[in-house]
């Protein structure tokens, strides 16, 4: 029987939670603190989802306009879909770059807020990002492409619609939509440093910017994993504590409960512990 004014580890149940063990006030507070840290993971998970949605939007647009282009050989398309495609591809690309760039910056700021701006953890995370910028053209190009989009213009200069025929009868056709950047315009912009301008010049023609999107997305997933590793005490350690607690009590659903006397009766206030989310964090590391 749970006693008023004490704290318990419980399993959720109606009408009353089921007591597993009495815990101290410090243990109760620590579990609530760990819960806050683990639930913060949802924010970062959503940001990754946002980035992936922007990737998907770009390639969904490619499929959509490729289908429209193919249809145009069979029926009239009564609006300027090619002009719309130009705007849509640039919109999706800019959204993708903005979403991953702000995500990386937010991770960096969060590490500083946890450990302090002069900490070894901040140095480790900054070093990781610096190495990424130094060693991956796609990453440093897209980071600076955001500035280009803000200060100069659309990064995609030309959307090319192509039809390829593989037999004289023209019955076997392949349709393609490509998104090209202008090497001349990009390489002449002071938005990029001399190294990146030279690298743009050396890229193969035609310069299809979309070919870098998946590579950059994979790099951002690695940044996320590095962030979780560096900030392990905020995410991984609390998650592991919840998993251990779940294993000790052989329960997938755990809660903490405090009992209080209110208006002459005992009420039980419970908070569910994020066991499933803790397992997801560990799976992502």
Language-model regions: role of each:
Residues 1-90, 121-285:
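Acidic, Ser/Thr/Gly/Pro-rich intrinsically disordered interaction regions
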Residues 88-134:
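Flexible secondary-structure boundary motifs
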